[in-house]
A protein has these predicted regions:
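Oligomerization/assembly interface segments of phage tail-like spikes and tubes
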Residues: 54-76, 124-137, 289, 325-327, ...
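Short coil/turn motif common to extracellular beta-sandwich-like domains
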Residues: 428-434
Length: 464
């Protein structure tokens, strides 16, 4: 992505580099009005970034938070009308000076000023800003409250509905052009485009169309509606480091072993310490998701179990620990099953987290992979971890804290029917024969042909 400069950046991280930090104060259309960095010799004014920190957590909704102190201020940086005011968007970038003298920055997020504090003393003029995630402009914190209940009809394109919400006029919440709540177009995954789901009434619909009518609360906000629409997809949603709303699939998040590695840590180099914590009470190895019930009393369901014998928390090691979740707006077995497998992965690793103390790095992103070479163990095994969040100082000095979970602990989920029998078997229950979707069955002249053998009412597949 950054070609030669990117490689130089990665190499420079291993040296005693000079840290860069920059705040860009944005116009409503996203263009830069003016900037402020951590250099005392700022060309625009004598003001500079004195101190601060950034905290990021992987979750739907608000993810990023910044506390920052500006020193040696002049009047241009007062929190006042026509200067830095309510709704001001500020982009934070961090980086370093490359060996050839080039300034190299990586965006860390676009924020809004939430709680400004100004201090005036003899010879001192500074301000402390609490910058909140751009999500605050749509969740009611700093904007985004709706005038009443907001509805999205079944059959509506979910991505189009999200985009139209962000285009609402921030002054009157109408659809008129001119002052959109978010001038930056959202980024949507293509994962769902060619996928369908079968609803409990037997109909098949595209995954990117709303399977049911959605209605927000009377006191709702745009963020609430977007979360409700993302829930229809069981998707991740939040603002990325460039300040763009992004919708990512949780379904392809299940196999994190295939993701690229952001950094390979070794103790004594960029890694200064590791802490492991276990919380067995928060672990579950059996997840049942119960969805909506249609007019014919058919309920959408999904179930996933950890039967992976390589997992420390599999059923055969610790016994069955079940978590039952009610998702009243899930109208298809496919969606319930995808959500069950995703939650199983989360519950399997909740009880085992790792915290790393490292040197500062600016390309670390939530929901991506880092590795740790455990040279203190025989064979120096490599551990893979999924980043859940981090905290990093904005100043030149100080260490970074990364919170992660072990990818090695993610189990291979086994899809099961609600009676606990794995889906590689056919189940005969009364007048109903349950056939796994992964196996084709032929019908000829009213005769159903299935490869397998029957024992105690269970037909085991010959080639599951």
């Amino acid at each position: 992505m950054y070609s030669k400069n990117w490689q130089q950046y990665l190499s420079t991280l291993k040296t005693d580099f000079t840290k860069l930090a920059k705040l860009e104060f944005l116009q409503p259309n996203g263009s830069v009005a003016f900037a402020l960095d951590n250099q005392v010799t700022n060309k625009r004014s004598k003001a500079f970034i004195q101190d601060g920190d950034i905290t990021v957590n992987l979750q739907n909704g608000s993810r990023r938070q910044v506390n920052i102190a500006l020193a040696n201020l002049d009047g241009a940086y007062d929190y006042a009308l026509n200067k830095i005011w309510f709704g001001q968007q500020i982009r934070l970038s961090e980086g370093l000076i490359l060996p050839d003298g080039t300034d190299f920055y990586i965006p860390q997020g676009v924020f809004l000023v939430e709680n400004p504090e100004e201090a005036f003393e003899p010879g001192l003029r500074q301000a402390s800003y609490q910058l909140t995630d751009k999500w605050a402009a749509i969740d009611g914190t700093l904007g985004g409250n709706l005038e009443g209940a907001y509805g999205v009809n079944a059959g509506t394109n979910i991505f189009a509905a999200i985009a139209s919400l962000l285009r609402l006029n921030r002054f009157d919440m109408s659809g008129t052009a001119g002052a959109p709540i978010d001038a930056v177009a959202p980024l949507f995954t293509s994962y769902y485009n060619d996928k369908t789901q079968t609803l409990t009434d037997g109909s098949s619909v595209s995954l990117i169309t709303a399977p049911y009518d959605y209605l927000s609360s009377e006191t709702g906000n745009i963020g609430e509606v977007i979360l409700g629409l993302a829930e229809m997809l069981a998707a991740w949603v939040g603002y990325n480091p460039t300040g763009r709303l992004e919708v990512d699939p949780s379904q392809d998040d299940i196999l994190d072993t295939s993701k690229p590695v952001l950094w390979d840590f070794s103790m004594g180099k960029q890694l200064m310490g590791i802490r492991y914590a276990s919380k067995p009470a928060e672990v579950y190895n059996d997840v049942i998701v119960v969805g909506a019930t249609n007019n014919e009393s058919l309920t959408a369901r999904g179930r996933a179990q950890n039967r992976d014998i390589s997992s420390d928390t599999c059923i055969s090691r610790i016994g069955l620990k079940t978590k039952r979740l009610s998702m009243k707006d899930y109208y298809s077995d496919e969606m319930c099953q995808a959500y069950a497998e995703w939650q199983l992965k989360r519950y399997a690793v909740l009880g085992k987290t790792v915290t790393l103390t490292t040197t500062q790095m600016f390309h670390i992103v939530e929901n991506q992979i880092i590795t740790i070479r455990r040279e203190d163990k025989p064979g120096a095994p490599v551990e893979r971890h999924l980043v859940q969040g981090f905290t990093r100082p904005i100043g030149q000095t100080g260490t970074m804290t990364i919170n992660a979970v072990s990818v090695n602990d993610f189990p291979i989920a086994t899809a099961v029917l609600d009676d606990g029998i794995a889906s590689d078997k056919y189940i005969v229950s009364g007048n109903t024969l349950y056939i796994p979707a992964s196996v084709g069955a032929s019908v000829s002249n009213g005769t159903l042909t299935i490869p397998g053998s029957v024992e105690n009412g269970i037909l085991t597949l010959t080639n599951p």
